[in-house]
């Protein structure tokens, strides 16, 4: 059975076959992915959403080696969006048909749980139709530790403030 048939029928590919996919032509990969999708949902329907990604800051205490956007001394200038700037971007997203806001910004030393709750409440009050897909798990841990509360309590407070889901 060739790799296209395996993928379309939900079969497992070998490590060598998976590596070979890196060199496959883009349209061939798309064709294989579509064949797999059709095997799972023969209706032929597909969907999408209009999502706005807002990185509210690139100031981060973690300084992860893999991160491509955090401020690096002398290389990338730090920035932090104001709450009003974030709200303006939300409005722009809604005007363009946006239905979801993804909000992330790292472990900012000045931002705590109370800030996040206030921001989410302002966004939900102004744009109740936006699905708020907000804050990475590491940001949530940062907020919980800063507030001296359990992670579950932090998640509950963010949800109560308007968070709909968490990325990652």
Set out the residue ranges of the language-model regions.
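Flexible, acidic/Gly-rich N-terminal and inter-domain linker regions that tether
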Residues: 1-61
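Conserved Radical SAM active-site core
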Residues: 73-168
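Surface-exposed loop/turn and secondary-structure junction residues enriched for glycine/proline
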Residues: 16, 24, 29, 57-59, ...
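Short, charged low-complexity intrinsically disordered segments located at boundaries
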Residues: 31-35, 59-68, 149-154
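Active-site cofactor/substrate anionic-group-binding motifs, chiefly glycine-
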Residues: 40-95, 166
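Conserved, mostly hydrophobic/aromatic
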Residues: 10, 33, 64, 103, ...
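Short amphipathic alpha-helical segments, especially helix-boundary/capping motifs
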Residues: 6-12, 63-67, 94-99, 130-132
